[in-house]
Each structure stands twice: as structure tokens, then as C-alpha cells.
């Protein structure tokens, strides 16, 4: 699961993934983070 701090970061992540980027690369690019659980931390719910 990916967690992003802002809607803009989420959009960047989604665009990157749609373009064929891997999850770790897109998370780093957008400022999002990949977690192993199912619930994002407070403030990372985008």
C-alpha cells in the first residue's frame, strides 16, 4: 500500500505508476511511502 502526504503527491505517484514506474521508484519520486500494513499514518492518508 502506498501512503502520500498530499493529493499532489498522490497524483504524481499514480501518474508515475501508470507510466510503468515501479512502486519504490514512484514513491521516491513523489514523496510517498510504501507500507506493508493496510492503514496509513496520520497525515499520510492521500
From Swiss-Prot:
Cystine connections: 3-40, 4-32, 16-26
One BP term from GO: defense response
Keyword Secreted: yes
Cellular localization per UniProt: Secreted
Single GO molecular function: toxin activity
Listed GO CC annotations: extracellular region
Keyword Disulfide bond: yes
InterPro entries found in the cross-reference section: Thionin, Thionin-like_sf
Record's keyword terms, sorted: Disulfide bond, Plant defense, Secreted, Toxin
PTM-bearing positions, type Blocked carboxyl end (His): 46
Family membership noted in the UniProt record: Belongs to the plant thionin (TC 1.C.44) family.
Function: Thionins are small plant proteins which are toxic to animal cells. They seem to exert their toxic effect at the level of the cell membrane. Their precise function is not known.
Protein name per UniProt: Phoratoxin
Source organism of this protein record: Phoradendron leucarpum subsp. tomentosum (California mistletoe)
Amino acid at each position: 500500500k502506498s501512503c502520500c502526504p498530499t493529493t499532489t503527491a498522490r497524483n504524481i505517484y499514480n501518474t508515475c505508476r501508470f507510466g510503468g514506474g515501479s512502486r519504490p521508484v514512484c514513491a521516491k519520486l513523489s514523496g510517498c511511502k510504501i507500507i506493508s500494513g493496510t492503514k496509513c499514518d496520520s497525515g499520510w492518508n492521500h
